[in-house]
């Protein structure tokens, strides 16, 4: 039973890759065909690999894993934050700061500072400070919240990372590899799949595609933590239907 259907993938545009001239040859096993200068991802493989990723994340969640969602480009930022929070996990959805994981202790000093500023406001300190100082503190807090707010309560270095577009998030991938953190990722046709532990071949530039796959990873965490009935919008499909395959063929033929 698959957790995602061919129809869902088609409707979200998961099959559209990059221009052929921008491809990474290592993605060849995941490419169905090429049409009008664009690579088309093999969705039959994507269905299977989403299942693999779902089970991997679910099993990690059952063991109490801390999962970090990463996606800093505009197409991914909102979904990464929303789905990480829905799953009770953590996220980075603005620029990845070099050393965010490999320099964990230094990053924690900034987390402490963010919490200090929040505490000052909660305790009424802002009310007795000069307005100019409050303005500066709010600016500092806004910047800290933007870059590290999503990991402020993360109890430790993550056990698993889910990344949207490892090509754009190469620093995050390198840090994960340095620390031995397994990476699950949406990998488009322009990226190198080799550093990724669990590859999900998919269009990582379409908001709907990113939302669909990212939501499934959140569902996996929730199911792992709470049981089979907890994940939202669970869709089961024995295999890709002939109708879906015909629809894909029509799309790539431009009909």
UniProtKB/Swiss-Prot annotation:
CDD domains: RPS2. Signal peptide: none annotated. Keywords: Ribonucleoprotein, Ribosomal protein. PROSITE patterns: RIBOSOMAL_S2_1. InterPro entries: Ribosomal_uS2 (IPR001865), Ribosomal_uS2_bac/mit/plastid (IPR005706), Ribosomal_uS2_CS (IPR018130), Ribosomal_uS2_flav_dom_sf (IPR023591). GO terms for biological process: translation. GO terms for molecular function: structural constituent of ribosome. Residues 233-255 are annotated as: Disordered. GO terms for cellular component: cytosolic small ribosomal subunit. HAMAP family: Ribosomal_uS2_B (MF_00291_B). Belongs to the universal ribosomal protein uS2 family. This is Small ribosomal subunit protein uS2. It comes from Lactococcus lactis subsp. cremoris (strain MG1363).
């Amino acid at each position: 039973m698959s957790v995602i259907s061919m129809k869902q993938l088609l409707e979200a545009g998961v099959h559209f890759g990059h221009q052929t001239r921008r491809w990474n040859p290592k993605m060849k096993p995941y490419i169905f065909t090429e049409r009008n200068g664009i690579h088309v991802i093999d969705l039959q493989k994507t269905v299977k690999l989403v299942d693999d990723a779902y089970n991997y994340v679910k099993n990690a969640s059952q063991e109490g894993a801390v999962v970090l969602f990463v996606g800093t480009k505009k197409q991914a930022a909102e979904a990464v934050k929303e789905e990480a929070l829905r799953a009770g996990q953590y996220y980075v959805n603005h620029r990845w700061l070099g050393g965010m994981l490999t320099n964990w202790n230094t990053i924690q000093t900034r987390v402490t500072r963010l919490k200090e500023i929040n505490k000052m406001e909660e305790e009424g300190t802002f009310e007795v400070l000069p307005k100019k100082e409050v303005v500066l503190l709010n600016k500092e807090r806004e910047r800290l919240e933007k870059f590290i707010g999503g990991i402020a309560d993360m109890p430790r270095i993550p056990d698993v990372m889910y990344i949207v577009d490892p090509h754009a998030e190469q620093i995050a991938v390198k840090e994960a590899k340095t620390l031995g953190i397994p990476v699950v990722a949406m990998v488009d046709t322009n990226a190198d799949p080799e550093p990724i532990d669990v590859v999900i071949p998919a269009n990582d530039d379409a908001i709907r595609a990113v939302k669909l796959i990212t939501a499934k990873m959140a569902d996996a965490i929730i199911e792992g933590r709470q049981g089979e009935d907890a994940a939202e919008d669970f869709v089961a499909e024995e295999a890709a239907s002939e109708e879906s395959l015909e629809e894909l063929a029509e799309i790539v033929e431009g009909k």
